[in-house]
Amino acid sequence: MSCAERATYHHGDLRQTLLHAAVRHIREQGTEGLSLRALAREAGVSPTAPYRHFENRTALLAALATEGFRELEERMRAASVDAERDPVAALHALGCAYVEYARTHPVKYHLMFGDLIGDFSPFSELLDAAETCYGRLERVLALGLEQGLLRGPDLQELGGHTWASVHGIAGLVIAAERKRATQPDLPIDEIRPLCAQRRVLESPERAVARLMAGIVIDDGALAALRRRTGDG
């Protein structure tokens, strides 16, 4: 850790310093070996100092996931600001924002949607952040249903299907990015699944739009969506 980073502790920012260090550790080494004591050594503070902010390792991971949901919700909110006027365009922008967040913040994304933390209920801030984030998607879908632009038996099922679709795209994008970074000489053109994965990475916006085509029932909205992504 640099002198500047160490200095942040003395200004009362140890909590954020530990969170940044945890992301760096997970990105470089995975979660194995991650502990509050190890992070304390990296921050140059006493082994007990992190416990003033986090009860245990799981609490620290929950804080990272909470931060992630709040960041994602901000991006989804910005993407869907025009949802009342055009729910379909807003849904596409929201889906693209979701995928882009996953691509640029894979550590937090895996904590948010993986099973490392487990039950969210002991962490009220995490639970609230996750529900607020999902509420952004639900609001746009509800507007689309109300305006007769989207098909779906009910809001809950439509939400699950839409989330699953975009989540799948995000997973492929993360995997393709990782392979490109760690295996640059991999003969992707000779491996059909990896070639398909790369195509999604090259144009996630088009992938989101094509999946949305299955739930958009308004011809005008569908045509506008295709024009927006150069797909028609």
Regions found by a protein language model. Name each.
Residues 17, 28-59, 63:
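Helix-turn-helix
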